[in-house]
Design a protein with these regions (language model features):
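C-terminal lobe helix-coil module of Hanks-type protein kinase domains
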Residues: 4-8, 13-23, 27, 31, ...
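Regulatory activation segment
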Residues: 63-75
């Protein structure tokens, strides 16, 4: 969306289609477990398709998910992983809600929810587990050189995020699964 400079309303319409697709998967007892922009395809006529269900899990699967120590290779994309995935805990539909929250945050603020210095996996894990992200309306104005904050269009977009959109994104990024929706 950023590459195509899609306006906020257009981004939100596409995101709602993503949410509908994820809701359909959840209604069929499927958790995607690796939702991220590269697994979301927008067709030329504007329809959204979810891709790569390779690590998806059936919720009624009697086989418990293996617990992975933090040092073991895991099958998910860390930047979009929920805290319970990082900890190697049980994955539920709320895991996908967290990943959707990261995608929404990026659509709203044009940045990831966590600002890291070194971008190491350990720093990402710590942020996912312990750092509370800024509101998207605040994050959209923060850059290292302040150039975006000086742009009238950026300030106008930030004002559109204050309130409901800020709250929805942060609710989806709650650290505890039972606090997300």
């Amino acid at each position: 969306c950023a590459a195509n400079t899609m306006l906020l309303d257009g981004r939100l319409k596409l995101f709602l289609q993503v949410c509908e697709a994820v809701s359909h998967a959840h209604a069929n007892l499927i958790v995607h477990r690796d939702l991220k922009p590269s697994n979301i395809l927008v067709t030329p006529n504007g329809d959204v398709r979810l891709l790569d269900f390779g690590i998806a899990k059936l919720l009624d699967d009697p086989e418990p998910a293996p617990v992975h120590p933090r040092t073991e290779v895991r099958a998910f994309t860390l930047h979009y992983a929920a805290p319970e995935q990082v900890r190697g805990e049980l994955v539920t539909t709320m895991t996908d809600v967290y990943s959707l929250g990261v995608v929404l945050y990026e659509l709203l603020a044009d940045t990831k929810p966590y600002r890291l210095r070194r971008q190491t996996d350990a720093e990402w894990e710590e942020a996912i587990l312990a750092v509370e992200p800024l509101k998207p309306s605040v994050a959209t104005l923060r850059t290292t050189d302040g150039s975006r904050a000086r742009c009238p269009e950026t300030r106008r977009n930030a004002r559109k995020l204050v309130g409901d959109l800020d709250n929805i994104a942060l609710k989806a990024l709650a650290k505890q699964p039972e606090q997300r929706y």
